[in-house]
């Protein structure tokens, strides 16, 4: 289902957005570690590294085709539904964009637990019902994800989310990003 062509189309479609989001992150959300969960070929990871190569950065991706075509060496093949054995580091930003709709809903808790256990701030989005897309088996209303994160001790940072979305809307962006994305912090 997720061929090399699928991942290449993500790179092509989302490259300008990845550039803008990396600009936003490096200017507005200081971090010493950047983790991208479900990173495909590492497009966003690579753009962060171009702007701040001194931070530790790692991307986790399940699909063989994506990992073998990775844009940077920091993409690791990993099934996010399994416990991620990594030590939590201070000041870690996690990114998880449009991943959970590709994972059976029975596995939402281990995935969000992995993300929650390793991050101090999270930028998250997941496809809404009716959004369309390849392999979408778990499209849910945004409020469902908000409640699930809340059950793990997270809340939306409304000011940071608004600021990020305003920045992204001022230039190239994918429609799903401004509809679905949010910044979460520990409550």
Task: Give the ranges of each region predicted by the language model.
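A short His-aromatic
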Residues: 102-103
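Short glycine-centered segments of the SAM/dcSAM-binding site in methyltransferase folds
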Residues: 121-123
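Hydrophobic adenine-recognition pocket in adenosine-nucleotide-binding enzymes
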Residues: 99
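Conserved N-terminal segment of class I S-adenosyl-L-methionine
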Residues: 1-90, 95, 106-118, 129-132, ...
